[in-house]
Amino acid sequence: MFRQRTRVLFLISAMLAIGLPVHSATPASGTLSGIANPVNWSGGPYTAVATDTSSCTTLNCDTFFLNINTSAGFFTTNSNDEVQIRITWQGVTNEFDLYLFDPSGNLLASSVQSFETFEEIDAGPLPNGTYKLVIVASQTVNVSYSGTAQIAADPTVANGKARYQPGKMTFGTPFELPRPNDPANTVTTLVFDQDVEPRVVHDSLGNLYVAAIQGVPGGVDVWKSYDSGKSFTYLGQPDGTQVLATTGLTTGTGLGGGDEDLAVGTSGNVYMNSLWLGSTTQASSFNGGSTWIVNPLSSDIPADDRQWIASYGNNTLYLTYKQLGTLLNGTVSIVVVKSTDGGITFPQITQVTTPVSGVQPGDQGNIVVDPRNGNVYTVFFDQTSTQVYIARSTDGGVTFDLKLVYQGPADTSLAHVFPAIAADEGSNLHIVFSDGVNTYLTTSQDLGATWSHVVRVNNGASTRTAIQPWVVAGDSGKVDITWLGSSSTNFLDSSAQWQVFMAQSQNGLASVPTFAQSTVTGVIHVGPVCVNGLGCPSGTRTLAEYWAPDVYLDGNALIVYPDDKNSGLASGAARTWFVRQTAGPTIILTVQ
């Protein structure tokens, strides 16, 4: 597909050089007054390239004026009806984008996607007035489009539709989390100079904790904020405690740092787990990170990968990981172990996937515990990376049942990179994942028994590609979804410019959810982002594979992410940066 796009761009450039006629929508306007009167128009043919509405000329954009003129109280009487707008064209290598502006000229909604032959806006019940539709020929060769606007019933069952609006969330100035320049924590090689795959969590007092990996055996760096994220104090490497006796260093270098995860208990216990070559190291602090008790063999079984932890109550901690074949003679399986003493020991061991279950796991996402009922959930792909599964336990992790959440196309990989799951305050579940082009959301309102139709989350010319998604849940049906986005349609594009994005949904359980999207950062990386783990070519995996945000006590988003563009390291390594939401809607309406 990328080679096809390159040929298309070459052809567009050649045709633009000889000059093209100006086109306009036919007709130029239309009126919707009721359900039985759809409006149709068309435009083109276009051979053009355009970024978005800011680059519009008469050669690459079309304008259609839509008049809404319904009777008084029409949408009150017809409460399930909405304005639906759709454009279609031929050929997935062509791209048109669709923008809707209100009578005052403000961007109201848009539909911008890639590798499709349509754009669609579900605009909701619009007040009477004249609205402007802008159709952008973002990448087209001698192709026309057809448009339709109608008033029709809102779907009562989720069918993949969503509404996309500009976000009103604003964010502060991002800053890097520094670490001391001492021999214990700064090594001159790329592997150890980095701090990637960060996670941020908070406790009930408002303290923030951040952890990020240097890479095996560089260890895990941990920071704490006492002032709601205005500043951070470096706490050292909790997994370094296990080698203090042999190194004689005051802070201690880590033995792990392959992967990490971070969690807090209800009374403030802090848990950090670090992957090393033999097992995982569980570091637990019962005094706010001042000191740590360390178990370097917390997985109980050797040969592990990509571990995750989740706390429940004050002293219960679940640890899950992908076991690489020790148990089943080379067969990969998912294991969950449980501690009831704050991570000091893990006596309960449960094998989640077995050959009998008929599911061979691929990449595994995070583990969560619903604090309202104690149910335990983890999410994973199958070995082909075309299926999404959850594993659910309703008996404290003793047994798990598996449920297929989503079956993707046979020729599409969903491993870009980990799926992520969250439980909201209503015990609803939310899963996000990426197919390398878009980030998708699916939800469950019955404890994981059934799942909604997947819906695209990212929207807009600046994020035609969306990878490395994560989801954080708040009140019932309310979620923040973050991802790494680029205007390029190929995540291996050597010139792609990547930014952090966040979409918020206040009605994630609706048949047509609404996503309000904001850009969180400037450019944090230029070039390809490989998602093939250790199989990636050199220099394409500097951002590693994930970053996990949080939502604070006041409902504002807390976001940590890797950045190799603004850190300024001579090695080109990425460091961990932090940014906090400063204004706008939140997913927790009742401040804790």
Task: For the regions a language model picked out, list residue spans one by one.
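Cleaved targeting-peptide boundary
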Residues: 25-31
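Short solvent-exposed strand-capping/beta-turn motif centered on an Asx-Ser/Thr pair
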Residues: 88-92, 138-140
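Sec/Tat signal peptide C-region and signal peptidase I cleavage site
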Residues: 20-24
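C-terminal PAP-associated
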Residues: 32-80, 90, 152-592
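Noncatalytic accessory or regulatory domains flanking protease catalytic cores in secreted, cell-surface
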Residues: 99-148
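Bacterial N-terminal signal peptides
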Residues: 10-19
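Bacterial N-terminal signal peptides that target proteins for export
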Residues: 1-10
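Short beta-strand/loop motifs in extracellular/secreted proteins, especially
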Residues: 81-83, 94-98, 141-145, 220
